[in-house]
Amino acid sequence: MKVYLLQDLPGTGKKGQIVDVAEGYARNYLFKNNLAILADEKLIEQVKKREEREQRKEEERYQKALDLKKELEGKAVVVKAPGGETGKLYGAVTTRQIAHALKEQLKLEVDSKDINMPDPIKSVGVYDVDIHLFKDVWATVKVKVEKE
């Protein structure tokens, strides 16, 4: 029996999915507890259309991320931080500072959680920083750290 799930059910499916379940399970548990409704042809068609729309949106976001990656590759941002005469900084450059520099200099809104630095930046120099744009799309941007 095909049912439309109204909630996530471990082992059965996620909310909004149409799944095939045993008739007894559907009637005695899913329907009685308002966890699912019977999936008729009209509902199945609506779910298919919704999934196709979501797939198209996903592909568009992926393509935008690829375009943005091409645009960002090779670009650099400058971050100024207080430091000593030897080139060592008094603190470390944070992902939040890099996100702010990206916003100010390249007009790119990036969440600081999407910026990946292998090690903290604690001295003046040029560093490669990875930015997570979409699922498996990463862009590398150069960050030039200068002393204030």
Curated annotation (Swiss-Prot):
Q: Which domain of life is it from?
A: Bacteria
- Provide a GO biological process annotation: translation
The reply to whether RNA-binding figures as a keyword in the UniProt entry is yes
Q: Which UniProt keywords apply?
A: Ribonucleoprotein, Ribosomal protein, RNA-binding, rRNA-binding
Q: Which GO terms describe its cellular component?
A: ribonucleoprotein complex; ribosome
The Gene Ontology terms for molecular function here are: rRNA binding; structural constituent of ribosome
The UniProt record lists the keyword Transport: no
Record-linked Pfam families:
Ribosomal_L9_C, Ribosomal_L9_N
According to its UniProt record, which protein family does this protein belong to?
Answer: Belongs to the bacterial ribosomal protein bL9 family.
Q: Which HAMAP family match?
A: Ribosomal_bL9
Q: What does this protein do?
A: Binds to the 23S rRNA.
Protein name (record):
Large ribosomal subunit protein bL9
Organism annotation? Coprothermobacter proteolyticus (strain ATCC 35245 / DSM 5265 / OCM 4 / BT)
Q: Which gene encodes it?
A: rplI
